[in-house]
């Protein structure tokens, strides 16, 4: 079962991290930004569509025949989402693992500025290990 991409958006909807895995076709930088802002907008709209006030947290899963998208949003508004093979079953656990790596290797990095692009080699390395990607 294949993980295609992982995206991290800050609370304003700005793409702060993106990584493709396997044979995923690479897009232009602007296309990645467009995908991130589109998902952020859809997530915000979905969270406001609930007939019961305050009961919706937005989009959590989108499933198609071609892919499965799973989202995890933190209490601070950071969104982690993964695009994977439609048969992949443990994406929620994977996203929690990515969140743990984010807190351990990005937020604790003294050179990282909150809400800015993530450029941390140790985070990339640990993420690749989590996903079983060979260097």
Curated annotation (Swiss-Prot):
<keyword id="KW-0333">Golgi apparatus</keyword>
<dbReference type="GO" id="GO:0006888">
    <property type="term" value="P:endoplasmic reticulum to Golgi vesicle-mediated transport"/>
</dbReference>
<dbReference type="Pfam" id="PF04099">
    <property type="entry name" value="Sybindin"/>
</dbReference>
<keyword id="KW-0472">Membrane</keyword>
<protein>
    <recommendedName>
        <fullName>Trafficking protein particle complex subunit 4</fullName>
    </recommendedName>
</protein>
<dbReference type="GO" id="GO:0030008">
    <property type="term" value="C:TRAPP complex"/>
</dbReference>
<dbReference type="InterPro" id="IPR011012">
    <property type="entry name" value="Longin-like_dom_sf"/>
</dbReference>
<keyword id="KW-0931">ER-Golgi transport</keyword>
<comment type="subunit">
    <text>Part of the multisubunit TRAPP (transport protein particle) complex.</text>
</comment>
<comment type="similarity">
    <text>Belongs to the TRAPP small subunits family. TRAPPC4 subfamily.</text>
</comment>
<keyword id="KW-0256">Endoplasmic reticulum</keyword>
<dbReference type="GO" id="GO:0000139">
    <property type="term" value="C:Golgi membrane"/>
</dbReference>
<dbReference type="GO" id="GO:0005783">
    <property type="term" value="C:endoplasmic reticulum"/>
</dbReference>
<keyword id="KW-0813">Transport</keyword>
<comment type="function">
    <text>May play a role in vesicular transport from endoplasmic reticulum to Golgi.</text>
</comment>
<dbReference type="InterPro" id="IPR007233">
    <property type="entry name" value="TRAPPC"/>
</dbReference>
